[in-house]
Amino acid sequence: MKIALKIAYLGDRYYGFQRQPGLRTVESVMRDALLRIGVANGDFCYAGRTDRGVSALGQVIDFWIEEDRAYLAFPRVINSLLPSDVWAWARAVAPVGFSARWSALWREYRYFLFSPDIDLSAVREAAGHLVGTHDFRNFSMSKVDTVRRIISIDVNAHCGIVVFDVRAEGFIWNMVRRIVGALELIGIGEKPVDWILELLDPSTPHGAPTAPPEGLMLMDVGYSDLEWEEDRYTKQRVSRMLISEARRRAAMSGVIQEMLRRMRDTF
């Protein structure tokens, strides 16, 4: 039978999603876990690759497993075989023809940008020009097959953090990070709003800057033929882990801010 899982991970601890020899990747640790529950060769399909430093909340994978071993294909069993910073938290029995990659109707990414003085109205105006079907050549390292359709872009801010939600039928390499990089320059006044129209012209000789990977997260992937069952125990356990992690990172942020304050005192 075919099983689909929603998985999440903290990307700054991995060298990306895709398996690479000698490097710690999300695919490699997931493959090892699936091998141990009896998935042939640990093989699975995934909704999309994420680069080094990029996290996920709603990555989706699917795999085949013999029916007499399907009782092992549940989040809490698989999580016992995974590092604590990668976890499955929802499960669905998938139809025979389902593919986490090819059956996806849309994907949604969220980017968190610290920019307390950004002009949200300018950013939202520029973002509106990106919705629809365009050639995003200037928003990617790729130079072939660069036409994509963005369904929506929402931009909000809270306590100095600007949150970009971008939903599209599909993305090309670095597309979201370059969209954020371009919108940030517009928001801080280094570029006019109309600059986004220049970037949408594939003949423009310059591309958009790339925002750092750590602020990016794969939020969700949409399908028409799955009924997800969330694992309550996993969500409770992971919530405790994330609270501890958030406290640790908040404390480290305080350390860095104090270092910055003292260094600035010298000039």
Curated annotation (Swiss-Prot):
Q: What is its EC number?
A: 5.4.99.12
Give the active-site positions: 51
For the keyword Isomerase, the answer is: yes
Could you tell me the Gene Ontology terms of the biological process aspect for this record? tRNA pseudouridine synthesis
Report if keyword Membrane is assigned.
no
Recorded GO MF terms: RNA binding; tRNA pseudouridine(38-40) synthase activity
- The record's top EC class is isomerase
Which SUPFAM superfamilies is this protein grouped with?
Answer: Pseudouridine synthase (SSF55120)
Q: Which residues bind substrate?
A: 109
The task this protein performs is described as: Formation of pseudouridine at positions 38, 39 and 40 in the anticodon stem and loop of transfer RNAs.
HAMAP family in the record, alphabetically? Answer: TruA
* PANTHER family given in the database record: PSEUDOURIDYLATE SYNTHASE, TRNA PSEUDOURIDINE SYNTHASE-LIKE 1
Q: Which protein are we looking at? A: tRNA pseudouridine synthase A
Q: What is the lineage of its organism?
A: Archaea, Methanobacteriati, Methanobacteriota, Stenosarchaea group, Methanomicrobia
Q: Which gene encodes it?
A: truA
